[in-house]
């Protein structure tokens, strides 16, 4: 059952809530946070949410580069 804690107003405008999309597609923590913050920035914390999304994208890039280097050696 969804309530204001599990289904906040800033996600109700979407056909599928970010959590459901993230879960259905098996996305990881950082990827999920990018989606969460990008989806809610207009309705919740504005630029702060976009900055958080960027931070998680930067982390994904760092870890992707580490994985690439591991696979190349």
Stretch-by-stretch model annotation:
Residues 1-73:
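Intrinsically disordered, low-complexity regulatory regions
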């Amino acid at each position: 059952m969804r309530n204001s804690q599990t289904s906040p107003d800033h996600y109700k405008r979407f056909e599928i809530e970010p959590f459901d999309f993230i879960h259905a597609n098996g996305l990881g923590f950082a990827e999920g946070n990018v989606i969460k913050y990008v989806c809610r920035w207009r309705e919740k914390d504005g630029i702060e949410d976009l900055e958080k999304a960027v931070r998680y994208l930067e982390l994904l890039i760092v870890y992707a580069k580490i994985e690439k280097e591991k696979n190349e050696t």
